[in-house]
Structure formats: structure tokens, C-alpha cells
Amino acid sequence: AEDSHTDLAVTYKTREELENCVLLPFAADTGLHAVMVGHIAAPNVIGSDTPATLSAELIAMISDAENTLIVTDSLSMDAITKAYTPGEAAIQAIQAGCDVLLMPNSLPEAYDAVLAAVQNGTISEARLDQSDNKILHYKQQFAV
């Protein structure tokens, strides 16, 4: 597999192969509080080269998005920056279910794009509130 620091990593495993191997730790009821999603594509699962970080379907395979804090890997990695602007990556990550977006290539561009997406209805305020509530919940729970 490629290194997502320099290119998009791709797995050609099927959903069943992933569920029976790589995803086994996520299937166990371990009380997982947070998970970092990497920039890996699984075209045999979702039919495209969309990185897991930007795919609601792939994120759903590894987490209970309602209770698990979903964190992106760095959005400044080449796996993202070669194909997406900072704004596109930020919007798609939020739409996919990510709660914390790490290190976009340009924070002002990512912020402005998300703000515009909320203002034009592409992202609902309720969606951002959901992430905000999860972050606050875990900050309280762990006294951070």
C-alpha cells in the first residue's frame, strides 16, 4: 500500500475481507471513545477512490458515529491535497461524519468553506452541533 503522506493508499479488499480481518478490532464492543480515520481508499467496497476520511460508508464500518469521536488524519497529507482543496476536504470530512479535522493545508480556506457550506445549507448547523456535543462530552468525561 502507498504512504498517504505522499499518495492515496488503496486497498482492494472486499467488504467481507475487511470485516474478517482489518476491522475485527472495531467490531468488538470495547467502549471505543475515538478513532482516527486514515486516507485509504477501498474501491471494492464503495466503488470509488474516495479516501476513508471523506467517506460516510467507510467511516460507518469502523464506528458508531453517534457515540464515537471521529478524527481525521492530517488533511495536509498529499493523499488529500493532491485531489482536494482544503475547503473541499473539510466539507467532505464533516459530511462523512468526522468530528475533528486535523491540520488542513490552509486553515483559513477550510474555515471559510465550512462557514459558507453552513450558510448555504450544504452542512446543517445540527451536524456541527452533533460534533460539538461529542467533543464537549469527552472533554468533560476525561477532564480535559
Regions found by a protein language model. Name each.
Residues 119-144:
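Mid-to-C-terminal alpha-helical segments outside catalytic/metal-binding sites
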Residues 1-116, 122-126:
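Second-shell residues forming the walls of enzyme active-site clefts
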